[in-house]
């Protein structure tokens, strides 16, 4: 295939008022078999390797841990932390930044209530955080960092901040990627492929920027491989036999299941933070959790089966 004949164009672009963006792209003139190869590679890179920004910790005046209650605030700490995960941020710097909030009730707190440095922009300022139902004052300090994929709150880091409650952070700016491959005939009646890619982002990056950045990451990856000398020593080949398979669900946060508040809080209080943690529980063991009833269990079972094809045994 002559790469100079490849054609890529954006054939659809949409932006939702609350922030998310959607784009559809067409890559034409591909040889047979190349559509699915490029589609799979782009999808993995777009979902796993692009950099994003998220709140990674909070310090709340008068609060010691995530199981505390804040006087005069409708939500508990776990609900507030869950709401904070929905705030979409865009940063002009990779450095750690801090934001602050100080508000006296009664008041409804949204993302726009947070005071941020000029390098940080809130994409969805109307996103709900909490409600102060009395005249109490709520003070929160936010730790904001950049990264890729997601990071669990219970992962240990040497630079943890004292008095901060660490939060699960989703850095991924691309929320969803779909693609399909179609066969077409060129002018010489030869079968060619065209690749249609659909990209949804959280609004901190456009689909056009996402596919451009993802393509460059792939190019640089293969460029670095091509510049290295291949080591054919037998020791290196033997080492590959000792690589242990990784459970694909081990590090997926339970927030990805998008459970309702009650079962989510029960799981978090039981220190069930990932799908891997959840898979350690049988249905009977789950029902033994405090305040975890049959309705919550049925929701968890159904969500695991419908989203991941997993059935607890």
From Swiss-Prot:
* InterPro entries, per the entry: DNA-dir_RNA_pol_insert, DNA-dir_RNA_pol_RpoA/D/Rpb3, DNA-dir_RpoA, RBP11-like, RNAP_asu_C, RNApol_insert_sf
Name the chemical reaction catalysed here. Answer: RNA(n) + a ribonucleoside 5'-triphosphate = RNA(n+1) + diphosphate
Protein localization: Plastid, Chloroplast
Q: Which Gene3D superfamilies match?
A: 5' to 3' exonuclease, C-terminal subdomain, DNA-directed RNA polymerase, insert domain, RNA polymerase, RBP11-like subunit
* Role summary: DNA-dependent RNA polymerase catalyzes the transcription of DNA into RNA using the four ribonucleoside triphosphates as substrates.
Q: What is this protein called?
A: DNA-directed RNA polymerase subunit alpha
Q: Could you provide one GO biological process annotation from this protein's UniProt record?
A: DNA-templated transcription
Q: Where is this region: Alpha N-terminal domain (alpha-NTD)?
A: 1-229
Annotated domain remarks: The N-terminal domain is essential for RNAP assembly and basal transcription, whereas the C-terminal domain is involved in interaction with transcriptional regulators and with upstream promoter elements.
Q: Name one Pfam family in it.
A: RNA_pol_A_bac
The organism of origin for this protein: Thalassiosira pseudonana (Marine diatom)
Q: Output the superkingdom of the source species.
A: Eukaryota
Q: Which UniProt keywords apply?
A: Chloroplast, DNA-directed RNA polymerase, Nucleotidyltransferase, Plastid, Transcription, Transferase
Reply yes or no: does the keyword Nucleotidyltransferase apply: yes
Could you give the subunit structure recorded for this chain? In plastids the minimal PEP RNA polymerase catalytic core is composed of four subunits: alpha, beta, beta', and beta''. When a (nuclear-encoded) sigma factor is associated with the core the holoenzyme is formed, which can initiate transcription.
Q: Which GO terms describe its cellular component?
A: chloroplast; DNA-directed RNA polymerase complex; mitochondrion
MF (Gene Ontology): DNA binding; DNA-directed RNA polymerase activity; protein dimerization activity
Report the sequence similarity comment from the record: Belongs to the RNA polymerase alpha chain family.
Alphabetical list of HAMAP family matching this protein = RNApol_bact_RpoA
Asked if the record carries the keyword Nucleotidyltransferase, the reply is yes
- Give the residue ranges for region: Alpha C-terminal domain (alpha-CTD): 243-313
Entry's EC annotation: 2.7.7.6
